[in-house]
Design a protein with these regions (language model features):
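Short, conserved loop/helix-junction motifs that constitute active-site signature segments
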Residues: 83-86, 164, 190-198
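Solvent-exposed loop/turn segments at secondary-structure junctions
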Residues: 71-75, 96-100, 147-150, 175-178, ...
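A domain-start/cap signature at the N-terminus of enzymes
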Residues: 6, 10-63
Length: 260
């Protein structure tokens, strides 16, 4: 499925609270906390963490979770949108390890080191978070922008074909210009493992003066060409530049992500 959009939003399938028969309290903005940094044995560095929690949490209820990368730049934007759209979702923000020129971010968002970053998220970060907070482990989203948007695409392809760790994927103007031939081959390799690819995947392209739209379109095309079953692939394109496209599109992205 492909959509070209300039703005707007659609109804959300996650909350809002007034859609639940059991709600007794009106929606309240979520709680935002800075957590201690977590160290990784897979990547050898530590990552500062943030978390957003639904304010009126209900006992014995679990909530969808979004693992959002680049949290030092994107966390507040996404959390603000969750509040605006009255969504009961847990948001885990993973900040970057800061080195010169953010080289760690660049290297670990690309193949093959993306495998180690994915191992950190799925085997170290998520167990740490999900033993402390009421996460619905069958409704996980991974979200990234630029280089980490590329990483989101790689996660889609490297995840377990039978029991994927993530069920939803959001890539904002991903840097799919990096190793294009390899990425195309990874799509083909994943298709060879099986036709089923269980995900709702949203690809956002920025077609302003500065943006990765040409390469986001390529990745969308490769996925369409592979003809995966169970892949709900949504392409959204905006007349925006590379950085502003996240804030411009996030409302539509989140409501599309959780629509029925």
């Amino acid at each position: 499925m492909a959509l070209v959009a300039c703005g707007g939003s659609s109804d959300s399938g996650v909350t809002p609270q007034d859609q639940s028969d059991q709600v007794t309290q009106p929606f309240a903005p979520g709680e935002r906390l800075q957590l201690e940094a977590i160290s990784s044995t897979y990547t050898g560095v530590s990552y500062p963490l943030k978390i957003y929690l639904p304010q009126n949490r209900t006992a014995n209820k679990t909530y969808p979770v979004i693992y959002s990368l680049d949290a030092e730049w994107r966390f507040e934007t996404i959390a603000d949108s969750l509040d605006k759209n009255e969504m009961e979702v847990i948001l885990v923000g993973v900040e970057n390890y800061v080195d010169e020129g953010y080289q760690h971010r660049e290297r670990y968002s690309q193949w093959p080191l993306a495998e180690d970053y994915f191992a950190f998220i799925s085997k170290e970060l998520a167990p740490y978070i999900e033993t402390q907070y009421p996460v619905n482990q069958s409704d996980r989203t991974i979200m990234g922008h630029s280089y980490t948007g590329l990483f989101v695409g790689l996660v889609l392809l490297m995840d377990d074909p039978q029991q994927p760790f993530f069920q939803r994927h959001v890539s904002f103007d991903g840097s799919f210009w990096a190793h294009t031939e390899l990425t195309s081959q990874l799509v083909d390799d994943r298709r060879a493992l099986g036709q089923a690819l269980k995900s709702r995947t949203i690809l956002v392209g920025a077609n302003g003066r500065v943006g990765n739209v040409v390469y986001v379109r390529k990745f969308d095309y490769w996925l369409e060409r592979a003809n995966f079953s169970q892949l709900d692939l949504i392409y959204l394109e905006y007349e925006q530049e590379h950085i502003p496209v996240v804030a411009h599109s996030v409302d539509e992205v989140l409501t599309t992500l959780y629509r029925e």
